Amino acid sequence: MIFRTIRIRDADDARLKAISKRLGLALSLDEMKAVRSYFERLGRDPIDAEIHAVAQSWSEHCSYKSSKYYLKKYLGSLKTDYTILAMEDDAGVVDFDGEYAYVLKMESHNHPSAVEPYGGAATGIGGIVRDVLCMGAQPVALIDSLFLGDVSSDRYEGLLSPRYIFGGVVGGIRDYGNRIGIPNVAGSLYFDKLYNSNPLVNAGCVGIVRRDRIVRSKSYKPGDVLVLMGGKTGRDGIHGVNFASTTLGKVTKSSRLAIQLGNPIVEQPMIKAVLEANDAGLIRAMKDLGGGGLSSAATEMVYAGGFGAEITLDDIKLKESNMSGWEIWISESQERMLMECYPEDVEKIRQIAEKWNLDFSVIGQVTADRRIRVYYKKRKIIDMDIEFLDDSPVYQRPYRIKEVEKSVTVPQEPEDLNSFVRDFMARLNTCARFNVVRQYDHTVRGSTIVTPFVGRPNKETHADATVIKPLENSMRGLVLTSGSRPNMVSVDPYAGTLLTLAEAYKNILSTGGRPHSVVDALNFGNPEREEIMGQFVESVRAIGDFCRKMGLPVVAGNVSFYNEYRKTDIMPTPTIMMVGLIDDVRRSRTTYMKGSGNAIYLIGEPCDNLTGSEYSRMHGYTDGFLPAPDLDELTRIRDFLSSKADMILSSHDVSSGGLFAALSEMSFGSGIGFHVDISNVSAARPTVKLFSECGNGLVLEIAKDKEEQFVDGSNGLAIKRLGETGGDRIIVDEAGLNIIDVAVDDLRGAWEHGLDRYI
């Protein structure tokens, strides 16, 4: 059957809802009424391909209908003079050195990873690479931030085991990224039972492109030819964006069919082919076929240019010969790219596709009118006003802001801190990530200067950020970091999001870079619930306030709503990917202690608050007053570190696990111990000083002969000398009394093997 007519003009409310449910449209009653009114004006009922096209374009995933208003309100003006493209195309573009630009994007692939962890995570990597590639850029680095369930829990009815999801997600990222030859260099991993049903897979990518070879995702001229290159089109991923725009139910056959199937063996030559065609100047515009498939890609590209399109589906290479027109139109099969070119360049691109053994089809042309017309087997299956398709409803949903707690709860002190810190450093959210991250290739392109792990052989520790040298003939580098603080955002969405951004900022400073740009992936529950919408609004407001204060552009983003199962929402999780610049990668700093007899300093005013910390959560406390970071102080820290860069041997930010975790991780990278006295940090209890995670703290290692020069000119910045490096033990005193004394290797063993039994 070529097409069916869907009778909606005479449908009452009940029938409209039934049509939406039966066809998997995920459109509300009001939206179905708007579709009915449109076709009433046309004097006909829609063809199946037309109503499916509307559902794709109007899905939460594609349209941002619940978030667009607030994103524009708080983030719309965040550009700088070095911003090239922000919030306009498939990825953000930022100047790198005047001649080259870097391209960056982060996307979520949450619902697919809940249903098919391996495939969902793999296609998340493939899709984000194509978002960067379609701007004409060579992908140079992958980033992934993962938020997974309690891996010790049993299978839930209708859901997959969190441990199974863990293994599948890591395996999908590993296999896709390693096979396409792009290093996976940065990210984060967080566990909580609230992610049991809704794991979050936030994938990011950074690329490099010559400024005169940047490709836009908008059409240029009527008469230009539209071509499709890459893999074949199949039934995999049909209704993927609709599925991603609703709450999760049980894992079923239909939900599995909404998952795309990735093939890195096609993606890798497609990267080569696209870059070859772009280097030859053959591509006028380009868009990845991601969520919504050809329907979204073609409509969005010509709409952005102010045009329309006429498209024929017959020559598209199919995985299954009996596919209907609407299935071809909305298929989300992976590894496909839509390109616009001059008519005289079609054969040149075809030859490049054949060289790399890729499928190639001429599918249509750009038209001057603002309509989209699609033909299949000599029948017109779509004839619609493109503005109606692409101008989805925009909702200003009501929201309620959580009342800020005034109290501060301090858990009881452990009787034996030596025993406690062994258990603490082995916890899921404080232990080493070696088992996961070592499955990824960090150095495949030969451009990774600082890898995710740094230190002496067999004594490695975590880096704060990684450094990539994207150009062969330049020492200029990109500093990359990504993560979120859902434990803090859950307590106070505004302050918690500021702390997320502050941590990313400190990670880049700690590595020797200067923060340069931001992208986000905002993961929340059901926006139809006022408290969830309130979390989102406060989080976006915090991103705007932070970036405006610190002079950073927000150049791209992604919103993932409806992350709930049976009215249980995820923790609000705004993931921040921040990119910094470093003028000379040879001046990068790392986190491990470099030698014995060096001084240890803490800079930044202590927070003296355990709210949201791993220490508090370990004791069952999840609420309380959460102070926002002092951004004026953070600015002073930035300037101070820049002026003292040559004196700093190593540095590490104070964040997850607090001051004790920061000091210990610095020690683990070399096996060198330390002896500190924390009595001058503040007047708070020892556990508060050791395990507080808020504030702007960084720990620095300074050579003894540079100390006087280092502390000179601090301009009121809080700088506390804690002690010295040396020996093979971790020793912490309070006012001259010893409170912790453990062997470095003993504590490292607990930290290093915390994940062993789960993956």
From Swiss-Prot:
Keyword Ion transport recorded: no
Enzyme category, top tier: ligase
Location relative to the cell: Cytoplasm
GO biological process assignments: 'de novo' IMP biosynthetic process
Name by which UniProt lists this protein: Phosphoribosylformylglycinamidine synthase subunit PurL
Similarity field: Belongs to the FGAMS family.
Sites where the protein binds Mg(2+) 1: E107, N558
GO molecular function, a single term: magnesium ion binding
E.C. number: 6.3.5.3
Binding site for ATP: Y64, K105, D520, G557
Cysteines joined through disulfide linkages: none
GO cellular component, as recorded: cytoplasm
Physiological role: Part of the phosphoribosylformylglycinamidine synthase complex involved in the purines biosynthetic pathway. Catalyzes the ATP-dependent conversion of formylglycinamide ribonucleotide (FGAR) and glutamine to yield formylglycinamidine ribonucleotide (FGAM) and glutamate. The FGAM synthase complex is composed of three subunits. PurQ produces an ammonia molecule by converting glutamine to glutamate. PurL transfers the ammonia molecule to FGAR to form FGAM in an ATP-dependent manner.
Assembly mode: Monomer. Part of the FGAM synthase complex composed of 1 PurL, 1 PurQ and 2 PurS subunits.
UniProt keyword Transmembrane helix, yes or no: no
Residue positions binding substrate: S108, H109, N110, H111, R130, Q260, E332, S333, Q334, S560
Catalysis: reaction(s): N(2)-formyl-N(1)-(5-phospho-beta-D-ribosyl)glycinamide + L-glutamine + ATP + H2O = 2-formamido-N(1)-(5-O-phospho-beta-D-ribosyl)acetamidine + L-glutamate + ADP + phosphate + H(+)
Positions annotated to bind Mg(2+) 2: D131, D288
InterPro entries cross-referenced by the UniProt entry: PRibForGlyAmidine_synth_PurL, PurL_linker, PurM-like_C_dom, PurM-like_C_sf, PurM-like_N, PurM-like_N_sf
Organism: Thermoplasma acidophilum (strain ATCC 25905 / DSM 1728 / JCM 9062 / NBRC 15155 / AMRC-C165)
Key words, A-Z: ATP-binding, Cytoplasm, Ligase, Magnesium, Metal-binding, Nucleotide-binding, Purine biosynthesis
Pathway: Purine metabolism; IMP biosynthesis via de novo pathway; 5-amino-1-(5-phospho-D-ribosyl)imidazole from N(2)-formyl-N(1)-(5-phospho-D-ribosyl)glycinamide: step 1/2
